[in-house]
UniProtKB/Swiss-Prot annotation:
Belongs to the ATPase gamma chain family. F-type ATPases have 2 components, CF(1) - the catalytic core - and CF(0) - the membrane proton channel. CF(1) has five subunits: alpha(3), beta(3), gamma(1), delta(1), epsilon(1). CF(0) has three main subunits: a, b and c. It comes from Caldicellulosiruptor saccharolyticus (strain ATCC 43494 / DSM 8903 / Tp8T 6331). GO terms for biological process: proton motive force-driven plasma membrane ATP synthesis. GO terms for molecular function: ATP binding; proton-transporting ATP synthase activity, rotational mechanism. Produces ATP from ADP in the presence of a proton gradient across the membrane. The gamma chain is believed to be important in regulating ATPase activity and the flow of protons through the CF(0) complex. Keywords: ATP synthesis, Cell membrane, CF(1), Hydrogen ion transport, Ion transport, Membrane, Transport. It is a peripheral membrane protein. GO terms for cellular component: plasma membrane; proton-transporting ATP synthase complex. This is ATP synthase gamma chain. InterPro entries: ATP_synth_F1_ATPase_gsu, ATP_synth_F1_gsu, ATP_synth_F1_gsu_CS.
């Protein structure tokens, strides 16, 4: 019984150490999540204004014959690019599994149309796609946790350049949108070619007071690029915040599970101690009876 008591004490100590780690990870994720949401909120007004410019340019008909609206595919095998935003680490519940599941579903749908090329952002997604033999773009090394407008700019330049060259004819993005701390949804969005109907849905009055210099077409090139950069940055930030929220939930659940396990082990330890005491009392009584 003494050995069993020592084992239970060792187990309680081990679970306590694990609980400290999960609690610390919960607090770190909560702190990072708040800072990341503040960053996302601070950049939102700028990208909302870019979206308004896009609407106005489309209403003016400036998208006509523009390659980013009309498409770059002419003939031969079609190539479809997919930006996949996953996490850099695990211990975040089903976050990465949900992204990978949506990625594989999209691959099944797109593979009938042509060759699918992945542009992974995040270590987990990249490792999975490479390990299972999917075509992954070379020299495309980005981490979710290093998200910034500068990084989003580099990604936008990379994929738009490939689109202009005809290396890809369509572009999609898979990311995770934060609904609440305990709920995150995976979103699949088509980025290129752009769909004019996305910008003219609902009521929108074109602003006749705006003058585009040197010309609306030149302005459109810049605005489209800024729009795509904003979409990619927003998707990366949303995904990163969602990953942190998922990790918070997972670590909170792990901490609660550790508490429950410790309670059960303490109860078990007390029972073992009680059994030892009962046995010792029985031995004393038996010894005393033998002496009579």
């Amino acid at each position: 019984m003494a050995n069993k008591t020592r084992w239970i004490k060792s187990r309680i100590k081990s679970v306590n150490e694990t609980k400290k780690i999960t609690r610390a990870m919960y607090l770190i994720s909560a702190s990072k999540m708040k800072r990341s949401r503040d960053r996302l909120d601070s950049t939102r007004p700028y990208f909302e204004k870019i979206n308004e410019f896009m609407k106005d340019l489309v209403v003016h008909g400036m998208q006509t014959n523009h390659i980013l609206f009309e498409g770059s595919y002419k003939e031969g095998q079609k190539r479809l690019g997919v930006i996949v935003i996953s996490g850099d680490k695990g211990l975040c519940g089903g976050y990465n599994a949900n992204v990978i599941r949506s990625t594989l579903n999209l691959y099944e749908n797109l593979s009938n149309k042509g060759e699918v090329i992945f542009f992974p952002i995040g270590t987990v997604g990249k490792n999975f796609l490479s390990r299972h033999g999917y075509k992954v773009e070379d020299n495309f090394n980005y981490q979710t946790q290093s998200v910034s407008v500068k990084v989003a700019k580099g990604i936008a330049q990379n994929v738009v350049k490939k689109y202009y060259r005809g290396d890809i004819h369509e572009l999609y993005i898979i990311y995770t949108k934060l609904i609440s701390t305990i709920k995150q949804d995976v979103v699949v969005k088509k980025l290129l070619p752009l769909d004019p109907s996305e910008f003219v849905s609902g009521e929108f009055k074109k602003d006749e007071t705006i003058r585009y210099e040197p010309s609306p077409t030149n302005v459109l090139d810049v605005v489209i690029y800024e729009y795509l950069k904003g979409i990619i940055f927003g998707a990366m930030m949303d995904s990163y915040v969602s990953e942190l929220a998922a990790r918070m939930t997972a670590m909170d659940n792990a901490t609660k599970s550790a508490d429950e396990m410790i309670q059960k082990l303490v109860l078990k330890l007390n029972r073992e101690r009680q059994a030892v005491i009962t046995q010792e009392i029985s031995e004393i009584i038996s010894g005393a009876a033998a002496l009579k």
